[in-house]
Amino acid sequence: MSNKHMKPTGFEDITSDRISSLPDEILLHIMSFMTAREAVQTCVLSTRWRYIWLCLRCLNTEICQFTSKKIFVRFMDNILLRRGFVPLDSFSLIGWRDDVSLNHPRTNLWVCHAIRSNVRVLQIFEYHGLFDLDHSFFISSHLKILNLRCVSTTALFIEKLFSGCPVLEELSMVDCRVFATKFSSSTLKKLTFISHTPHGEDCVHDDFEDLVIDTPSLVSLHLEDLPLLNPCLVNVSSVVNASFRLDEESFASSDVNCNIISALSNVTKLKLYFGLHNIGASGLPLKTDNLESKATNISFNCEHLKKVKIRCPRGDKRAQNIVNVILANAISPPEIVIDQHTPWE
C-alpha cells in the first residue's frame, strides 16, 4: 500500500498540532518573543490562531520589517485600533533603518495608547536622528521601566515623568539629548544616563551646570558622557553598583565639588572610566590639577566597597589620585584594577 493511503498512527494523530492545542495563555507567552508583525501573521495558520494576537500583552515593533514608513504607520494604526485597550506588559518601538525613522506625528499617539493600556515596560529606540518625545501623557500608576535611545526631552519631561509615574523603578536614557539638570525620584532603583554628544558637538548646555541626582531608593547608577555637567549626588547612599565615564570637562570649575565617590557610602562595586579629549604632544592629559586638588580633600565612608575598576588613558594621574583617596578611607582594601589604554584604543 502506498504511503499516501496509509492512516496516521496514534502517535502521529496526537502530535499533529500540539502547539495549537495549547491554552491561550501559553500561546500568548510564546508570541511575546515575536515582533508584532510576526505575531499578527500567525492569524493565517488556522481558525484557532485567527484572533489570538488581539490579546497580546507584549508588542515589539521593529521598523526594519517594513518597506516604507507609510506601511509601518498603517500597520501600527491598525494593530492598536483592533486590539483596543487590552492591558500591556511591554511596548517597544525600535527604529533600525536610515530611511524609516520614528519621527512621525502619530508616534507619540502610539506611546500615549500604550500608557493608557497600563504598560509596565516602555521602550523607544531610535538610531538615526533624535525623536521628540511628548511629556504630556506620561501619567501612569503602572509604568515601572522606561528605556529610551536617541530621544530628545526637556527638563519639564523629567519633572513630569517622576511626578506622574509614581512607581517608576528603572530609567535608561542612552544617546539622549536631555535638557535637564535634576533627577529627583523616591522610587527609582536603576538609572542609566548617557548623553547625546556626537563628535564632541551638539552640547546640551551652553554653560557649566550641576546635574543633581536625588534618588534615595537608587541601587544602580550609570552616568556617561556628560558635557558641561558636574554630577552632584544627593541621597544616593542605597547605591551598591555605580559606573561613571567622565572626561575632563566633567571636573571643570563648578559651585559644587564633584562628589561621585564621597556620596556612595554603601557602594560595593565601582567603575570609573576617564576619557581624553585634549591630548598634548606627549599623549597625556592636559588637565589634572583640578581633580587632584579636590581628591586630596575627600573624606568618605566606603566600608562596603569590595571592587574598583578604573579605565583611563595611559599615564593619567587621576587614576592614582582616586586610588589614594579610596585606600585612605577604606576599612579593608578593596580589589582595585587599573586598565590603562592608549588614546587610539
Residue ranges, per PLM feature:
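Segments adjacent to and within acyl-thioester-processing domains across lipid
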Residues: 243-249, 257-266, 271-272
